[in-house]
Each structure stands twice: as C-alpha cells, then as structure tokens.
C-alpha cells in the first residue's frame, strides 16, 4: 500500500468524523466527509463547495487522485459533483474541497460529517508530444461520435 501525506485541518477529523478509510479489502475509493459546523440545505439546481477538513500532498508525479460522486447520493437524491470529477495533482498541498450540485427536484440537507464523495488514486503517465505530418492509418481512422452505430 502506497503512503500518502495528509494533514488534518479540522480537529473533528479523526475524532467526531472518521479519517478516510477503505470500507472493504476490495474498495477502490476512500469516503470523504463534509466538515461542516452546521447542516447545509442544497436547493434544486444549487451548487456549493464543501470542505473536508483534510489537506493532501501526493508527492509522486506518477500518481493523482480523483474525487468521484457516491452512487447512492446521485441515484437516490440527485446530488452529484458540481464539476463531475475532481482531479488532485500530485503537487497540490491544499485542502480537499468537494463541489456538490443538487440536480434533483427536492432540497437535500448535507449534515456535518456526512459522506459526500469518494477519492480514488490513479496512475499518471505524463506524455511528450511527437509532431507528425500524418498518422499511420488505423482501422478506425477519423471515425468519431457514433461511428460504430448501435450494437
């Protein structure tokens, strides 16, 4: 298991609110919690930025983290990430913030300490571009959106 540096910015994290952990041995994501002083009402169509009370420094350019929605919040309540996916670069050292968007029809209340998103670590390959005049032909070529039809 890879070690990643985190800093607790809110003393409730690790006490009132658990540190992010993997729920099972096969879990890919760590739950992030809303580090709030009081409940936040998220009206339909509204977005807001929620603190997690944690700062992170991955420190390894071959890794990044992505913040993803929790499936139950989106499916049952229409609450998803405001930016759809959050990307945490390896050299970022600030607080993890989660943008949430209520795309549902009903107000949704986010309680202090509630699990609001999940964080997954992913490998990164930094590419260097090789300028060419033409590409070697492939079977697909320039076929884009919908080029293979409905199967």
UniProtKB/Swiss-Prot annotation:
SUPFAM superfamilies, sorted: dUTPase-like
Biological process, per Gene Ontology: dUMP biosynthetic process; dUTP catabolic process
Pathway given in the UniProt record: Pyrimidine metabolism; dUMP biosynthesis; dUMP from dCTP (dUTP route): step 2/2
CDD domains: trimeric_dUTPase (cd07557)
NCBIfam families given in the database record: dut, PRK00601.1
Function (record text): This enzyme is involved in nucleotide metabolism: it produces dUMP, the immediate precursor of thymidine nucleotides and it decreases the intracellular concentration of dUTP so that uracil cannot be incorporated into DNA.
Protein name (record): Deoxyuridine 5'-triphosphate nucleotidohydrolase
